[in-house]
Amino acid sequence: MKTVLLTGFEPFGGETVNPSWEAARQLDGETIAGARVHARLLPCEFGAALDELYRQLDALRPDVAIAVGQAGGRPDIAVERVAINVDDARFPDNAGRQPIDEPVVANGPAAYFATLPIKAIVAGLRERGLPATVSQSAGTFVCNHVMYGLLHRGGPRAGFIHLPFLPEQAIRHPGAFSLKLDDCVAALRLAVELSLTRGKDEKREGGTIH
């Protein structure tokens, strides 16, 4: 049986929950498109997050690996296109580290593109009434750090998805968009399914002008 690694993060930045882990863990043990999903929690820490990710990649040898993170304030589900070789933290991670203008991997390539069918995923989400977009930047915090490290490692079809706040988080952030947990779970389930069943990605617009 094929396997899928789905990772989420612990809460960070003063939050008490993280939608990435709350959604990912709902799919742990589920079979999607003939593949078994294994959800794993990553620390929101530079270095340690990749250490744990690599342990899970070695243990599971997945066919697909999708890392998931929180992007509070985003108005949609963001399917990431690219990860860059830069750690530039606006505030410390959960271990108190705040790297500024440091490489994720010394002497590594400037960037990596996701190998997931990102446009097919976005199209599929929109068809189901879920707000989604192709994102051109995964930021420079631990999410980008993990996405870059995942793609640098190589192996499974891989990429990263950012989820917006959950409603209980948005209450503390007036005006912020939120998405129900059930919708977050449905989005990840579809992303896993399409990553397993779609070959070449769809050729359709998904760019931005800024």
From Swiss-Prot:
The keyword Protease applies. Disulfide bonds: none annotated. InterPro entries: Peptidase_C15, Peptidase_C15-like, Peptidase_C15-like_sf, PGP-I_bact-type, PGPEP1_Cys_AS. GO terms for cellular component: cytosol. It is found in: Cytoplasm. Pfam families: Peptidase_C15. Keywords: Cytoplasm, Hydrolase, Protease, Thiol protease. One of its GO terms (molecular function) is pyroglutamyl-peptidase activity. The active site is at 80, 143, 162. The keyword rRNA-binding does not apply. It comes from the Bacteria. GO terms for biological process: proteolysis. PROSITE patterns: PYRASE_CYS (PS01334). Its EC number is 3.4.19.3. It is an enzyme of class 3 (hydrolase). It catalyses: Release of an N-terminal pyroglutamyl group from a polypeptide, the second amino acid generally not being Pro. Removes 5-oxoproline from various penultimate amino acid residues except L-proline. Homotetramer. Belongs to the peptidase C15 family. NCBIfam families: PRK13197.1, pyro_pdase. This is Pyrrolidone-carboxylate peptidase. It comes from Chromobacterium violaceum (strain ATCC 12472 / DSM 30191 / JCM 1249 / CCUG 213 / NBRC 12614 / NCIMB 9131 / NCTC 9757 / MK). The gene is pcp.
